[in-house]
Amino acid sequence: MKTSDFNYHLPEKLIANYPLNSRSSSRLLVQSTTIEHLLFKDIINFFQQGDLLVLNNTSVIPARVFGNKESGGSIEVMLERVLEENKALVQIRSGRSPKIGSNIILNSLIVKCIGRQDSFFILQFDRSPIEIFNAIGHVPLPPYIKRPDEELDRHRYATVYEDKTQQDSVAAPTAGLHFDNTLLELIKNKGVNIATVNLSVGAGTFQPVKAENIEEHDIHSEYLEVTPEVVDMVLETKKKGKKVFAVGTTATRALETAFMDESKKGFCGYTKLFIYPGYKFKAVDRLSLIHI
C-alpha cells in the first residue's frame, strides 16, 4: 500500500489556529454508510445505553524548550520521555547536532548531552527533567498550528479529564479536546459507561511517514497502561452486544494492544502497534478522531 495513497490537500485557511470558546461546539463529521456534518455535542446521539466510552487520561508536559549550544548556536529540545531520575530522551533541532559530551544551555540551566539513541539524544540534568520542563517549557503545539504557544494553551491543549498525576505526554490526545464536563455528564446519564486508559503520547507522533510503502514505516513506540478492570469492561460490553467507543488513536492503540494478548489480563509496557487499512479490530467498535 503506497504512502502517497494517503495524501490529500488541506488548505491552510481551514486550520483553526485557536480553539472555540466552547469545546463541544466544534464541528463533527460522522462517516457510516453516509457522511453527516454536525456539531461535536451531537455525538451523544450515537451512544446507546450500555455502550462503553474509553478515554486516554494522560496529561501533557510543556515539552518544548529553546536554548543554545556551547558554540552559541540556537537549539530546540523536544522531550520524548524520561529515562531515569535525571536523564531524558529528546529530539533536537539545530543547524548542527550537538557533540556527545558537550553542554547545552536552556534558559541559563546547563545540561549535558551524554549519548544518542537512533535519531534521539540523551540529556543529563541536575534534577528531575519533568520539574525543569514544567518550569521553562513551552506547550508543544502540533506543527500545523503556525503560531507560538500562549498561556491559554496550557488549559485548552489539554482534556478536561486529564489526570495530572499522569503527566507523561508530549502531545495531547487531540480527539478528546472537544469533550467538556457537561457533555461527559450527559453521556453518563444516558447509561453509557466510561473507562480510562493511559498512553503516553511521544514526540514520534509528529514525525512524518517517509517510507514509500505504508507497511515499511517504522512506527514509534509508546508506553501505555490498560488495567484488567478496563479489559473486563470491554469484554462485558461486547458480551451484551453493545459498542466500545475509543476517543482517538491513542485510546485505540492502547485497547488494541491489550487485546493482542489472548489472556486479556490488561497490559503495562511499550507498544509498536501500527494500525492501517486491513487491520482487524479486536476491541474497538467506534473511533472518534481529531475534530476541527
Where are the regions that the model predicts?
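A cross-family signal for N-terminal binding/gating loops and helix N-caps
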Residues: 1-290
